[in-house]
């Protein structure tokens, strides 16, 4: 799975825009295997700690290699609830 495909898969399942700081077509050899999205009342920090950071560790990356961007193009605070971030995207 390429980085681009991984980012798109996360967005389709979680409705959260994640940017991984690697070349878009670099192979990651890992996939995003979760079937259900994280609940709306969870914070961005919880989402990253439980889902994204463990995946980055498997790829061999640190937490500094990922960003989350809301629908306004901003980097939300780590304590922002996911429903706020999800509702910021144009549907």
What are these regions (language model features)?
Residues 1-91:
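Basic helix-extension-helix modules of the SAP/HeH family
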């Amino acid at each position: 799975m390429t980085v681009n495909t991984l980012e798109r898969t996360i967005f389709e399942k979680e409705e959260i825009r994640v940017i991984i700081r690697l070349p878009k077509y670099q192979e990651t050899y890992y996939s995003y295997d979760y079937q259900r999205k994280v609940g709306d009342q969870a914070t961005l920090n919880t989402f990253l700690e439980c889902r994204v950071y463990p995946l980055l560790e498997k790829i061999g990356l640190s937490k500094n290699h990922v960003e989350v961007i809301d629908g306004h193009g901003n980097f939300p605070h780590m304590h922002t609830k996911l429903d706020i971030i999800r509702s910021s995207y144009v549907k």
